[in-house]
């Protein structure tokens, strides 16, 4: 019997509150995939170098690795044991960290590989929205088969801003409205730069919630995975396992798929006017148009 090998490394990225958890849960219900709670491995431990596709290690990831394993109910794997203070005392020496950036990044990816193999699946899905800006770096450090695939979740800006603004009020550092607008503008502008890359795929929240089966069929085909109708029936419990008790704003993600548009309730008229004025909604239409062209003319969201 041929040993099980990793055939797919899949990252779901995008602006928070764009539907990334919904998509993650759907994909993780496939019989050949597994997924985890948000790792934050790169966003919390690496710093991007402005104007480059490079990032450097700036924080010891060992505590984050241990917390991630505990959150997912997993015992250590070989790749995670590598981070122990006995094996790598230099991880506690901040000046040394940047020199080991590539080595550590690859070891972190290997943790996902080994967990997936332990679970008996050849594909894994990692979903941390903030990893969007680390896509170029993840490409660089993953210079081996299988090449990583990146799924960008795109949602109407007004709805994202309203949802992000509301959800962040329970965070330690809530966002003001301008921060939410800036986050959407900058992140969607970044996703737009990736439209031509063959390893990047684009899913629109409006299409996923109104036409879940054809949208998922196309995405799975692009990822090299067969369609499984059970996904739409069984994704709820899978999604629930990917949400921690510290994420109450995700509590309803595993419910039946429906389009959610709540900006008219979450924001007052003055706030909606401010969002309309500052939001670069043209980015949404541009990325939808270019994704449609790349997909061979499949209708873009309205």
Predicted features by range, described:
Residues 18:
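ATP-binding Walker
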Residues 54-59, 63-85, 126-127, 135-138, ...:
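Anion-recognition interface
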Residues 21-33:
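A conserved segment at the C-terminal end of the G1
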Residues 38-127, 131, 256-257, 261:
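PAPS-dependent sulfation machinery
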Residues 1-10, 165-169, 173-174, 185, ...:
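PAPS-dependent sulfotransferases, especially Golgi type II membrane carbohydrate sulfotransferases
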Residues 15:
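P-loop (Walker A) phosphate-binding loop of NTP-binding proteins
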Residues 112-232, 242-256:
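PAPS-dependent sulfotransferase catalytic domain
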């Amino acid at each position: 019997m041929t040993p099980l090998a990793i055939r797919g490394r899949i990252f779901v990225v995008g602006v928070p509150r764009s539907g990334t958890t919904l998509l993650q849960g759907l994909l993780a219900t496939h019989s050949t995939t597994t997924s985890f709670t948000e790792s934050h491995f790169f966003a919390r431990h690496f710093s991007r170098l402005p104007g480059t596709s490079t990032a450097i290690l700036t924080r010891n990831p060992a505590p984050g690795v241990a917390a991630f394993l505990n959150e997912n109910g997993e015992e250590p794997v070989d790749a995670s044991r590598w981070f122990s203070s006995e094996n790598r005392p230099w991880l506690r020496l901040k000046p040394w960290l940047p020199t080991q950036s590539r080595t550590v990044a690859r070891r972190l990816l290997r943790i996902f590989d080994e967990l997936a193999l332990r679970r008996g699946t050849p594909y894994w899905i990692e979903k941390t929205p903030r990893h969007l800006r680390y896509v170029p770096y993840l490409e660089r450090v993953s210079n081996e088969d299988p090449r990583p695939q990146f799924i960008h979740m795109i949602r109407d800006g007004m709805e994202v801003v309203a949802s992000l603004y509301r959800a962040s009020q329970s965070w330690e550092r809530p966002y003001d409205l301008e921060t939410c607008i800036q986050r959407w503008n900058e992140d969607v502008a970044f996703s737009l730069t990736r439209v031509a890359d063959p390893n990047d795929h684009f899913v629109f929240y409006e299409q996923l919630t109104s036409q879940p089966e054809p949208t998922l069929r196309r995405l799975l085909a692009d990822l090299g995975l067969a369609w499984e109708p059970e996904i739409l029936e069984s994704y709820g419990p899978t999604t629930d396992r990917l949400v921690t008790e510290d994420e109450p704003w995700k509590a309803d993600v595993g419910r039946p798929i429906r389009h959610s548009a709540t900006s008219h309730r979450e924001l007052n008229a003055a706030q909606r006017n401010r969002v309309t004025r500052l939001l670069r909604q043209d980015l949404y239409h541009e990325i939808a148009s270019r994704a449609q062209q790349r997909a061979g003319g499949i209708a873009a969201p309205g």
